[in-house]
Each structure stands twice: as structure tokens, then as C-alpha cells.
Amino acid sequence: MIQRMVFLAALLGVATLTACTSMTSSDAARFDAIVASPVRIDADRRTDAARHPTQFLPFTQVKPGMRALDVSAGGGYTSQLMALAVGPSGVLYAQAPNPGATLTRRLADHPQANFVVVARPFDDPVPPEAHDLDVITLIQNYHDIANLPVDRVRMNRQLYAALKPGGHYIVVDHAARAGTGTADTRTLHRIDEAVVRNEVTQAGFVLEAEGSFLRNPDDPRDKTSGDSPFFTDKFALRFVKPR
């Protein structure tokens, strides 16, 4: 009986995830148009094969008019996608402690009023004007933050406070072997998925969905993410702030 209940619960979880990520033809066309936008740089397009943007975007639940924050924006790959997804009626804040040239050059080449770069520390990543957010992304950099003297509990709580009830926090990263914790964050640039789940839910978030679109079961997860001869196994987690 217990095994049957566990099996049914698993089926319900899969059904819920399928329902959350289902798209209409107009949604699919919108995401295709975002990925094809001439605003995106060549480096973005070369990265698409490893990032699967047409699957990532619906997973985030982003819609036009939303208020979004991309934490640890790096060169702006995710920030640009999200800025295009929220559109001119929305706003995307791209956070970085020290915004780099690739990120700032995007706006110099293609000014976008809804794409706002903010220099903020990870301990206090949310600018005062970025309240009532609909979605927050932290993509492939949670492991890097773990290498810094950053209070991740404080960071996640600040992100929780900045979101609207029902808002989403998306974390994607290179998967380390189960049980390794943060041991591989500096050497292999990977993190144990369980660490992220635990730290984020401690801030009050609830895990709503897991994405399989970046999974690679053939990855032994024992090589540096940048040196892997194939696409790394990545987890994609969507957390929600309860209503």
C-alpha cells in the first residue's frame, strides 16, 4: 500500500510539472521570437545548445509585463532572455557585484529601457526599487556564490522578501555527485543539488517543479564543468513563495 501511494504521488508530481510547463502555440511562437531576437549577441546563440532557452523560458513562468531579477547576471545571457520575455511593459534587473564589460556593452549596443543593470553585493542583491517581483533567476552561479564569504541564508531570505506571494525563484546549476555538499564548488564548479534545495527551502520557499531539460545522465559529474567533453548534468529547480 505504501509503495502504491508513493508511486501515485510521483505520478501526480509529474502531472503537475507537465501542467505547469505546457504551452499554447502562441506561447511557443513568443519564446521562439525571443530566442531569434536580433538584440541577442552571437555568444548567446553559441550558448543556446547547452542552455535550451525555448524550454528554460516556459519553465520560469515568465510573462510580458512581469518584474524580474537575474541574480549573478554574469555576461547577461539569462538577463537578456528575461528582459525580452517581460517586454517593454515589464522590467528586468540584472544584478552583479561588479558588472562586467560584456553585460554593460549589451545596453551600449542595444539600449533597452526595461533592462536595468544594478551593482549590488550578493548579501544584499535586491535594489530598493525592485519590490513585488514576479520571478527571480540564479543560473549556474549558486556554486560560485558558495565560494565567496556570502551569507546565503541572508541572500535567500532577501530574495524571498522581494517576491510577490506566488512568485518564483529559479535555480539552475551544474550537478555534483550526491552527498558531496559544497566540496566540489571550487574545484569542479559543481554543487550538490541537495544543498540548494535545503538552503532555499529554509528561507521559506516551496519546491514547485523540477525541470529535466538540462539533465544528462551520462555525465559522471567528476570533471570540471568547463572541461567536460559533453554537456554537464544540470538541475533546474523552480521554487515558489507561498500565497
Model-derived segments and spans:
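Class I SAM-dependent methyltransferase Rossmann-like catalytic core
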Residues: 31-57
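C-terminal motif of bacterial Sec signal peptides marking the signal peptidase cleavage site
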Residues: 17-19
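A short acidic, Gly/Pro-enriched loop at the edge of an enzyme's catalytic core
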Residues: 126-136
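A short glycine-rich, Lys/Arg-flanked "PGG" loop and its adjoining helix->strand segment in the class I
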Residues: 83, 152-165
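Conserved beta-strand signature within the Rossmann-like core of class I S-adenosyl-L-methionine
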Residues: 166-174
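Core SAM-dependent methyltransferase catalytic element
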Residues: 219-243
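Conserved class I S-adenosyl-L-methionine
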Residues: 65-74
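A short SAM/SAH-binding and catalytic strip from SAM-dependent methyltransferases
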Residues: 134-153
